[in-house]
Amino acid sequence: MVPAGLCAYRDLRRKRARKWGDTVTQPDDPRRVGVIVELIDHTIAIAKLNERGDLVQRLTRARQRITDPQVRVVIAGLLKQGKSQLLNSLLNLPAARVGDDEATVVITVVSYSAQPSARLVLAAGPDGTTAAVDIPVDDISTDVRRAPHAGGREVLRVEVGAPSPLLRGGLAFIDTPGVGGLGQPHLSATLGLLPEADAVLVVSDTSQEFTEPEMWFVRQAHQICPVGAVVATKTDLYPRWREIVNANAAHLQRARVPMPIIAVSSLLRSHAVTLNDKELNEESNFPAIVKFLSEQVLSRATERVRAGVLGEIRSATEQLAVSLGSELSVVNDPNLRDRLASDLERRKREAQQAVQQTALWQQVLGDGFNDLTADVDHDLRTRFRTVTEDAERQIDSCDPTAHWAEIGNDVENAIATAVGDNFVWAYQRSEALADDVARSFADAGLDSVLSAELSPHVMGTDFGRLKALGRMESKPLRRGHKMIIGMRGSYGGVVMIGMLSSVVGLGLFNPLSVGAGLILGRMAYKEDKQNRLLRVRSEAKANVRRFVDDISFVVSKQSRDRLKMIQRLLRDHYREIAEEITRSLTESLQATIAAAQVAETERDNRIRELQRQLGILSQVNDNLAGLEPTLTPRASLGRA
């Protein structure tokens, strides 16, 4: 077990420096990043000269994305699979709590920091704002939910800063609580973290093959976050781990999930760090994880960010070139003033038509989200209705009091699956709608408009706060109670038959009356048992319906809020683009008018200035064309 505390950080840091070297992790090819930053700066300078503050803001945000990338990797899995130990061994630092109990109790975000640090992010207080409270590094080894620094407020997550070279290039690990323990959320709760993740590591030990919940989670996680791997842990404990890995690989192949499986041993990794043993480190197979993070995660995320930034630069240069080119054509041709009146009318008509065409995106977005909201809500209700019907059929086939734990587990798993499937489907439909809106701009001849990216936290949610299915009291009938029910039913039979038999001279209690009493008593007992079973089944069905209604109330609200947030994101994204396009067309017309009124003495200076700015924009575009085909270098994370 990796020790916790600041002293442990210092000791392990010295060991790491002796063994692996303090290799600095940087994004791949910093010189190429410098070229992109230089292109952004040149474009910003031209935008400022032309008083295009909107383009300056967009390019400034793009500059921040390219210079300070953060690649988020979610570590998820069932309870007791070795997730936290994997993270600690990967970083060579005690960044996450490890123990025999439920170690990770809240989400832990580990990112780079020159000095070890830790803080709690607390839930919103009475003023509606969250708070961050610094805590000693030693406290991450305790249950932070009860930390005195929280002041009784709910702890949303723990943010840990670790001086690990692996994190210096922008990697950030999100360690999630294990699933399956007392009070732990379903595996679908982790789905809410995946849309904001660049990769996912699904941790499963080699004691057994994938369980059904694990396979379901792997399939759904791959649909939301295609970049990921399965990490098979504890290979040092199970001699038959290779058979388990091969079986799990076959399961993934049948499920059509192209995720690699990396078998590792955190214990061997810890010993390798302690003993400065490179051969033991290779045997732990941790270099394979580092290679995966370097080649498949960090480099791909960097390429995706760069592609988006290059698109922003290209869009800005095109808009600036429209305005500058229009002005230059007028200034450079004095005879154009004679044709200015008719030409301006034509340009105005073209501008108005272009603006009207770009305005179609609002209709596409509005209609699309109305359909999406209705479809998602209908899909969720259909799934919940199916869960309810299946549960009622299961209840009708047994005694609920004897099988209530099994029924409750099946219902909760079915609800988690339904919520997760609906979540994934809504995410995919939202991405498709974003592409449809971008296509409406392309139909208007504006091919440089990029589709909005939905990968940030707008799709995130919290499925872990859903209440559990209520209990049902299982009280089997005692022998005495059964006798009372039978005697209550048999008494009438004994009296009735006894009185009839008294006509022929028999007593009240005779073989006929006793036999009739036994028959009627047995019938009364069976009828009471049947009524009791019907009553219990009715109560169980009502319990299930009430549970599903509660879940539907919470999840439907979360779904609507999530879709509204996506709609606002798309609306703001495309409204900003539409305003930029409209402004570019308007300023192009204004520049044409102003250029026609330029005095002869100022004409030459203005021509040179316009040619200089257009030349810079042309060089920027040439450099963009040269950068695009080479966006495939692999990031380097240093040695494992």
Swiss-Prot record:
Forms multimeric structures containing a central pore. Induction: Specifically induced by a broad range of inhibitors of cell wall biosynthesis, including antibiotics that inhibit the synthesis of peptidoglycan (ampicillin), arabinogalactam (ethambutol), mycolic acids (isoniazid, ethionamide) and fatty acids (5-chloropyrazinamide). Down-regulated by the nucleoid-associated protein Lsr2. One of its GO terms (biological process) is response to antibiotic. PANTHER family: SARCALUMENIN, TRANSMEMBRANE GTPASE FZO. Participates in the development of tolerance to both isoniazid and ethambutol. May function through a MDR-pump like mechanism, although it does not appear to directly transport isoniazid from the cell. InterPro entries: Dynamin_N (IPR045063), P-loop_NTPase (IPR027417), TRAFAC_Dynamin-like_GTPase (IPR051943). Disruption phenotype: Deletion results in increased susceptibility to isoniazid and accumulation of intracellular ethidium bromide. Its main location: membrane. This is Isoniazid-induced protein IniA. Keywords: Antibiotic resistance, Cell membrane, Coiled coil, Membrane, Transmembrane, Transmembrane helix. The gene is iniA.
